[in-house]
């Protein structure tokens, strides 16, 4: 099992248990075990340097699997998944309970890939599909 935890700058965080491994050298069962044990941290335990697009897509799929595990609504989860860019090209939300937030009743994902934003209104926002009223607007640009 992959034991080293590192950040995307490649620096060791001091918790080396065994050498990190390439996602391409793991099988689906091992990747599931990594998710079971480390959640989003599983991706940090794989040493792929993001120059290999095949390995990057495997990491993206691992990330997608974990988002689907955390976000209880499948439609919302799909709106949060990286499909159109390699993992690491946009900020990755690992440790902030970001994805858990979407399970709260008062939180709604407005996926601008699915419905275009028309305007910000005094009480919220209007998209091509709906009007949304809210107290707080979070712009997440990646």
Feature-to-residue mapping (PLM):
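N-terminal FAD-binding dinucleotide-binding subdomain shared by FAD-dependent oxidases/monooxygenases
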Residues: 1-142
């Amino acid at each position: 099992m992959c034991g080293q935890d590192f950040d995307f700058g490649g620096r060791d965080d001091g918790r080396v248990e065994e050498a990190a491994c390439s996602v391409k050298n793991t099988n689906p069962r091992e990747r599931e075990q990594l998710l079971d044990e480390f959640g989003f941290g599983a991706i940090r335990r794989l040493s792929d340097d993001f120059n290999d697009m095949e390995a990057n897509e495997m990491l993206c799929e691992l990330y997608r699997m974990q988002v689907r595990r955390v976000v209880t609504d499948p439609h919302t989860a799909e709106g949060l998944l990286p499909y159109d860019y390699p993992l690491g090209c946009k900020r990755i939300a690992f440790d902030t309970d970001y994805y858990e937030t979407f399970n709260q009743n008062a939180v709604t994902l407005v996926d601008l890939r699915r419905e275009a934003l028309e305007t910000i209104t005094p009480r919220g926002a209007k998209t091509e599909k709906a009007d949304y009223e809210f107290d707080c607007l979070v712009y997440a640009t990646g």
